[in-house]
Amino acid sequence: MHAYRTHNCAALSKKNVGETVRLSGWVHNKRDHGGVLFVDLRDHYGITQIVADEDSAALPVLDKLKLESVVTIDGDVKARDAEAVNPNLPTGEIEVFARSVEIQSRAEELPLIVNSAEDYPEDVRLKYRFVDLRRERLHRNIMLRSQVITSIRNRMTAQGFTEFQTPILAASSPEGARDYIVPSRLHPGTFYALPQAPQMFKQLLMVAGFDRYFQIAPCFRDEDLRADRSPEFYQLDFEMSFVTQEDVFQAIEPVLAGVFEEFANGKSVTKSGEFPRIPYAEAMLKYGTDKPDLRNPLVISDVTDHFQSSGFGLFEKIVGIGGRVRVIPAPNTQEKSRKFFDDMNDWARKEGFAGLGYVTRKQGEFGGPIAKNHGPENMQKIYDELGLGENDGLFFAAGKEKDAAKLAGAARTRVGEELGLIEQGCFKFCWIVDFPMFEYDEELKKIDFSHNPFSMPQGEMEALENKDPLEILAWQYDIVCNGYELSSGAIRNHKPEIMYKAFEIAGYDRETVDREFSGMIEAFKLGAPPHGGSAPGIDRIVMLLADEPNIREVIAFPLNQKAQDLMMGAPSQVPPKALRDVHIRTVEPPKKQQVGTHLVNDDS
């Protein structure tokens, strides 16, 4: 017999009745029924019920053990009585009568209870993550992550992609988020950077003549954390040679749709080949965001024209200085009280906006300050244009175009949630396409890149030389699912002269481009194919499939929201010698002192 087990804790069934078996695992739960002790023995695979009565040598040992102690049990498999069968367990038709028990490890007082769904503070869960990972939900999430990655690998290989590995110690890049830097011992005063993405390397693989690359790539970004962000994360990084934007879509849609269908647990998924293509400008108008949740049926409309010379002072003033007025319908709100609408306005102000105007309507009668100021006839024109009914309310977001779009987008989400309009049980994908190549930076008073500076502009050199930069679109695209951006990608700018021209428009001279991006530019001067790709985030994919609120619930050992590893104590100080070896010293940041109601740096 094996030293620890003949079967795992999910393997036994009625066909094993009469056998003598050996099981090992954690003491998940105990129930004392007056001289008979029932123990749920748990391992990675499942749970088996162990029975120890007064005739069993295992009874006094098991009785004294604390939960989560690790034991090896020898015993006989017996069928449960009909009334004792547990249909929720694979082993629910049998139980093992313990003959003997060997203690492998005694558990002390537990910081959190494994067999309970009780919630615990995140700092406790992260400090004792190895215990938290024993809990069913989190254990299941990590297994789901493994299965998703395996499925992705198989599907990418089937699509003709080859898996590569790219360097972890790389050069620092001037664009994007902050780098995590690593000092060099052999080259004093110089630093490596952990890659924010394998962007340069994967493009250079295309220049090297490989055709379809992918990897499950670790990425590192020193940025502020959110529920859907982590300083270290993984992405399905891929790149393809001699492709158009449509070729990229056709390659990755079957992978994403297939993975989601495989693990959706009954939820519907947008079919491959049917991902809607939504231009960026349309997304910002209709949804107020470039990450639209298409489960929400509400659509934003622009009614600016209705308030030009309208006599409604506030909106007329906003429109007069180039602002926009956007509206969000609130269907069938005739039974909602005035408080519902006022609460939405209060919510907008708490979110940092100036406020959210509204119109109420019940059986055709308009209500609210905007309807009063704009007049029922003018309001009816808006309702007719938008196809709204006699019991539909309307919320108004007004201001500079970006501000109005942002408020309208947030309000669309809020109204959809408050009215229960968000469709459940589905994953709705879309592509956001036709991003602007450039934007005007109000703070710097100059034109700069809108998103990815290395995207190919639509129209290439002709567009750069002849069009208004703010009208030039890029071959850039995002994949969005249920309001989450899963990936950004682009057809790359592989032509040095077009790249120089694009950077020139954004205010960078040729010398700066050569200095900052020498590796890429020099490679492109030696023969580069047209190429493009993307990089869907693994953590966000698993988060959606697991129906979790943040990505820390699908990462085995995540950092907390302060980028700390509470379990291992990272980041930590290192011995002075370790700093001397890499030729660096630490300088404490200036302490902040309270002066009146403000914190100021103490630079003395």
Swiss-Prot record:
InterPro entries: Aa-tRNA-synt_II, aa-tRNA-synth_II, aa-tRNA-synth_II/BPL/LPL, Asp-tRNA-ligase_1, Asp-tRNA-ligase_1_N, Asp/Asn-tRNA-synth_IIb, AspRS_core, GAD-like_sf. Keywords: Aminoacyl-tRNA synthetase, ATP-binding, Cytoplasm, Ligase, Nucleotide-binding, Protein biosynthesis. Residues 199-202 are annotated as: Aspartate. It catalyses: tRNA(Asx) + L-aspartate + ATP = L-aspartyl-tRNA(Asx) + AMP + diphosphate. Belongs to the class-II aminoacyl-tRNA synthetase family. Type 1 subfamily. This is Aspartate--tRNA(Asp/Asn) ligase. It is found in: Cytoplasm. CDD domains: AspRS_core, EcAspRS_like_N. Homodimer. Disulfide bonds: none annotated. The keyword Aminoacyl-tRNA synthetase applies. ATP binds at R221, D222, E223, E485, G537, I538, D539, R540. SUPFAM superfamilies: Class II aaRS and biotin synthetases, GAD domain-like, Nucleic acid-binding proteins. GO terms for biological process: aspartyl-tRNA aminoacylation. L-aspartate binds at E175, R221, H451, R492. Aspartyl-tRNA synthetase with relaxed tRNA specificity since it is able to aspartylate not only its cognate tRNA(Asp) but also tRNA(Asn). Reaction proceeds in two steps: L-aspartate is first activated by ATP to form Asp-AMP and then transferred to the acceptor end of tRNA(Asp/Asn). It comes from Erythrobacter litoralis (strain HTCC2594). NCBIfam families: aspS_bact (TIGR00459), PRK00476.1 (NF001750). One of its GO terms (cellular component) is cytoplasm. Its EC number is 6.1.1.23. One of its GO terms (molecular function) is ATP binding. HAMAP family: Asp_tRNA_synth_type1. It comes from the Bacteria. The record marks H33 as: Important for tRNA non-discrimination.
